[in-house]
Amino acid sequence: MSKDPGRILIFDTTLRDGEQSPGASLNLEEKLAIAHQLARLGVDVIEAGFPFASPGDFKAVNKIANAVGKENGPIICGLARASKGDIKACYEAVSPAPKKRIHTFIATSDIHLKHKLKKSRKDVLQIVPEMVNYAKSLVDDIEFSCEDASRSDPDFLYEVIQLAISAGATTINIPDTVGFTTPSEFGNLIADINKNVPNINEAVISVHGHNDLGLAVANFLEAVKNGARQLECTINGIGERAGNASLEELVMALHVRKSFFNSFFKRNPDSPTPLTAIRTEEITKTSRLVSNLTGMTVQPNKAIVGANAFAHESGIHQDGVLKNRLTYEIIDAKTVGLSDNKISLGKLSGRSAVRARLEEMGYDLSREDLNDAFARFKDLADRKREITDRDLEAIVSEQVQLPEAKFQLSLVQVSCGNASKPTATISLLNTEDNTEDTAVSIGTGPVDAVCEALNKLAKVPNELIEFSVKSVTEGIDALGEVTIRIRRDNKIYSGHSADTDVVVAAANAYVNALNRLVFSEKKNSIHPQFDSLENSTNTFLSNNAN
């Protein structure tokens, strides 16, 4: 049987696999904000990125290792392909963290070996022990993944796993890379690994899965029953294609059905000991932060964190809930951090009151960031009678999107009505040469006119593919959250902003999307799965020695 830590370890890969969602690219400050919140949430491991991808990715992982890596905090992990260049870059990036891990991988399915790696099984059997041993010479905590394990020949898979453990791997990850398996198949795969790998008792079994068939969470729960003790997941289930296994769904399934799962941990069914170390009351805030910063809107009927997750429309259901919530609710909304708390902050509230409330909400801002947040708070308070926690969340989350901005919006002025053509006047500052230009455009509506004017000024070709707006809170003076997604060269970039004026919010969101596009094209990143190992050269290391 594999090594059993006595509970489930939560491995969060929002900043690595989650960021690979189309349009979900994050800047350094955004990644730091999410990493800090993941630490508050209580995840065991943060996979901070793929350091070899680009100098920007290396810097982000290194900064997270410095700022978030603590003795009593999460393990900071980086991803590396099974090559010395990748592994060395990963080690250098995570080295500042007291608790660090190198996560290296290679594909084991025949379809990947033939068409992607152009390698034989014999090649893989040589590469795995050599690269795991090299990683082990740098750090003690090594995770090894057999990419596309669920479509690999079982006997070959067992052989690869045995070699990886013998070379020093302490965690063996079994990915369902394309979301192919069903729960019973995935559970049997984990059980068979436990039976057929002689040294599996020296490593923790981890699972990683995608949601292409909508089965990722179900697969993971079946894996837990068969001995998996680390779950690799993302906030809101974001990730490539249909996404990854959802952290909040997994955690709350284990929380709500603890009496069922306790027996698989050799506990009494009524044992009160939690199955994870997650602080569930941080779930909603974490979900909103990730949604705001990535621009990936959470569907209303999403389990646990969707807007309708605790809503009841049916009169029969409403009557039952009013009499006893347990009639139709299996989770207390407060357990995941939802509350009806409305604070009495307004235009007369001072800096200390705002700081105190932000600290209560878990935000630890520097003096400079607090000054910026307070200025935004006062501006909003002049336009809105009451400031709620959701308003403060919107202020803080938008604030961390500002760094690395080539363009800054200076002026938005719109004229529209049923008897006139919508016209927008926009002034845009180019921070690279400190020049400001103004353009006027006509559109089919005020937002279209704003986007046309911004395109004239920015001169960054793109296609607008999504515009959405939703209310942050109730009331006619509520903040409107706007998400805009643009496309260029088959890549998608998101922008997000909130304002009491949705046209101003749309303008800011569009500028944010343009800034992401420009910044992303400067990064010139490589993809951990799609780019060949031949890209793993020492050139990167020489440029990032410091």
UniProtKB/Swiss-Prot annotation:
It catalyses: 3-methyl-2-oxobutanoate + acetyl-CoA + H2O = (2S)-2-isopropylmalate + CoA + H(+). GO terms for molecular function: 2-isopropylmalate synthase activity; acetyl-CoA C-acetyltransferase activity; manganese ion binding. The keyword Metal-binding applies. Its main location: cytoplasm. Pathway: Amino-acid biosynthesis; L-leucine biosynthesis; L-leucine from 3-methyl-2-oxobutanoate: step 1/4. Keywords: Amino-acid biosynthesis, Branched-chain amino acid biosynthesis, Cytoplasm, Leucine biosynthesis, Manganese, Metal-binding, Transferase. The keyword Transferase applies. It is found in: Cytoplasm. Pfam families: HCS_D2, HMGL-like, LeuA_dimer. CDD domains: DRE_TIM_IPMS (cd07940). One of its GO terms (biological process) is L-leucine biosynthetic process. Its EC number is 2.3.3.13. Its cofactor is Mn(2+). InterPro entries: 2-IPM_HCS-like, 2-isopropylmalate_synth_dimer, AIPM/Hcit_synth_CS, Aldolase_TIM, LeuA/HCS_post-cat, LeuA_allosteric_dom_sf, LeuA_bact_synth, PYR_CT. Disulfide bonds: none annotated. It comes from the Bacteria. GO terms for cellular component: cytoplasm. Mn(2+) binds at residues 17, 208, 210, 244. Residues 408-546 are annotated as: Regulatory domain. Residues 8-271 form the Pyruvate carboxyltransferase domain. NCBIfam families: leuA_bact, PRK00915.1-3. Catalyzes the condensation of the acetyl group of acetyl-CoA with 3-methyl-2-oxobutanoate (2-ketoisovalerate) to form 3-carboxy-3-hydroxy-4-methylpentanoate (2-isopropylmalate). Homodimer. Belongs to the alpha-IPM synthase/homocitrate synthase family. LeuA type 1 subfamily. This is 2-isopropylmalate synthase. It comes from Prochlorococcus marinus (strain AS9601).
